[in-house]
Amino acid sequence: MFGSIGVLSFAPFSFKYALVVSYTYLIYKLFRSNDNRNLNNLFLWSFGYWGIGTSWIIVSIYYYGNVSLLGSITLFLILSIGCIIFFFLPILLLKRVIINKSNNLLLFVPFILILVEFGRYYFLGGFPWLLPGYIFLDTPYEILYGLIGVSGLSLLLYIFVASNVVLYSNKTYLLALNLFLFISLMSPNIFESNKSDGDIVNLAIIQPSTDPFKKFDNDYLNDIEQEFVSLSSQAAEKADILVWPEAPLPYTSESARSQNLIKNIEKPLISGFFSYQDGNLYNSIINSEQEIKYNKRKLVPFGEYIPFESFLRGLISFFDMPMSNMTRGDSPKQMNVGYGSFSPLVCFDIVFGEMVRKDVKSSNYLINVSNDTWFGNSFGPYQHLEISRIRSIENNIPIVRATN
């Protein structure tokens, strides 16, 4: 239960202090409690945290993957257990080798937890989701994103919760520290960020909320195209640049149909599009002002590519979803439009903070296109937006985000 309590710290709930309670409980149970059920405590906490926190995955599997409820739950459990094991094993190893003294607890627990966090960034393509450092958004600590990043704030939280366990017998210090943190986390951010003295650019974000089922149904294609053209024409009266979401239409940017559509747009257009290059299918961003394309570098497993494809492809309908044979892009791109340069990012790309940091060095702003309708009204789109906002603050650069 206490693992699931920690999920309340993230969007859409944003009760920040819940994660402090959750992690303090975990570390206390593992390293200070006389309870011999360490394995059970760790597994149940991990399942509550990852199972509830990433429950949005089941929405895309069940509703849009055309998989039975039982099959959806089974796949979701397999994916959740993968997250759990990656978190579970290093903590269990630490429990086996640590000497049960306060100074060791303070030294080793935060260190191991932050190593696990780094590992999740890189292992099997990476899944840096539900990081403790995310909870400091919209608090006075938000200013630290630009100084020490998400990982630095995660480390500070790990040190704090380990200190809670060390100070457990000293109730006065424990209460004072936690009261201060609770009040400060509940306080609004008073520091300005992303203030720019540059030229003002008017961008219009076109988000028609297209049903994913209809997008791949030819009976609806003309209506979807007309909606994009109509909304863009209305927005073009005041906007300098138009931004469409990720892959808003089911054909490639090279097709005659897409070229004709783009010609009907009155202003510079930045949009997600499928693209076909050198025999490979990509999830891309196109710029109507330039020939170059940006190809998404962080593909979503089981959605845009199928791991172990020779074994899994065709096993169930979920593994044959449209456009699930994408190729990964191999380099960042900086794009230019009449009002400056921007770093393009597609959907899951925005989650990888270190990659984004390297991309934005000479850009005026970020543009992130996404298609979060695959996850309905679950936690996923809210958590995704939360992470996107943090990327902007970390790099002190404005972000434009269009999602369907």
Locate predicted features.
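Membrane-embedded alpha-helical bundles of multi-pass enzymes
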Residues: 1-191, 388-391, 398-404
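Soluble catalytic domains of enzymes that build or remodel membrane lipids, polysaccharides, and related
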Residues: 193-404
